[in-house]
């Protein structure tokens, strides 16, 4: 195994869902910016980046969220950095956001955009993404988990712990964030939370996973 392969495997064995962080240890600005950049630079379906990363460092807000986030209470108290990942709503070919991405970010020439829109519509129809608003939002939310995974892997490579969380009252937390002007519910929904910091103690037992042959199947020669 090469040094790089070993480094990657070591990071995955190091990573675990840290329930309680050492509140005295803070992630450096440089390291945390690298974690955020790994999220921002993550791949997404059609390259549309249907996400927003909101870093919650205000302790009063963390305390308010804690009362409605049963799966994140200890992390909200102790994490060095706490991130909410929003998923964008209404990502359709002719929505203002997609038009902005095509014209201003990807710099498509005007005459090529109708063909791109047609391919976009066909893709969403084939995958039943455009069937209803919930399917459309779920598709965006899936993309946020790509960024989430990359952020946690980057953290592990830097020797930083993390914990992804879905254990919260979605409606109540959404209301709190919306009332504070943090979440525009017309444009976004809260997809997932993730905390970063340094573990208070090592996990009590080794990582457990199913066997390789139980979850991986090769069709054709194994090379």
UniProtKB/Swiss-Prot annotation:
It comes from the Bacteria. GO terms for biological process: 2,4,6-trinitrotoluene catabolic process. Its EC number is 1.-.-.-. The keyword Flavoprotein applies. GO terms for molecular function: oxidoreductase activity, acting on other nitrogenous compounds as donors, with NAD or NADP as acceptor. Its cofactor is FMN. GO terms for cellular component: cytosol. It is an enzyme of class 1 (oxidoreductase). InterPro entries: NfsB-like (IPR033878), Nitroreductase (IPR029479), Nitroreductase-like (IPR000415), Nitroreductase/BluB (IPR050627). Belongs to the nitroreductase family. This is Putative NAD(P)H nitroreductase SAB2397c. It comes from Staphylococcus aureus (strain bovine RF122 / ET3-1).
């Amino acid at each position: 195994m090469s040094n790089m392969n070993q480094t990657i495997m070591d990071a995955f064995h190091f990573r675990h869902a840290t329930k309680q962080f050492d509140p005295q240890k803070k992630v450096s600005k440089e390291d945390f910016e690298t974690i955020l950049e790994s999220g921002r630079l993550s791949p997404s379906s059609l390259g549309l980046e249907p996400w927003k990363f909101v870093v919650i460092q205000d302790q009063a807000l963390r305390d308010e969220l804690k009362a409605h986030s049963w799966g994140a209470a200890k992390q909200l108290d102790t994490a060095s950095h706490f991130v909410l990942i929003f998923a964008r709503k209404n990502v359709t070919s002719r929505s203002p956001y997609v038009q902005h991405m095509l014209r201003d970010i990807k710099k498509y020439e005007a005459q090529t955009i109708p063909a791109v829109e047609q391919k976009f519509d066909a893709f969403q129809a084939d995958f039943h993404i455009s069937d209803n608003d919930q399917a459309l939002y779920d598709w965006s939310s899936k993309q946020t988990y790509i960024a989430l995974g990359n952020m946690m892997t980057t953290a592990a490579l830097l020797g930083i712990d993390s914990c992804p969380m879905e254990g919260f009252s979605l409606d109540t937390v959404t209301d709190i964030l919306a009332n504070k002007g943090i979440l525009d519910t017309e444009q976004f929904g809260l997809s997932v939370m993730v905390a970063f910091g340094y573990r208070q103690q090592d996990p009590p037992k080794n990582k457990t996973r199913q066997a390789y042959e139980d979850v991986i199947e090769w069709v054709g020669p194994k090379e």
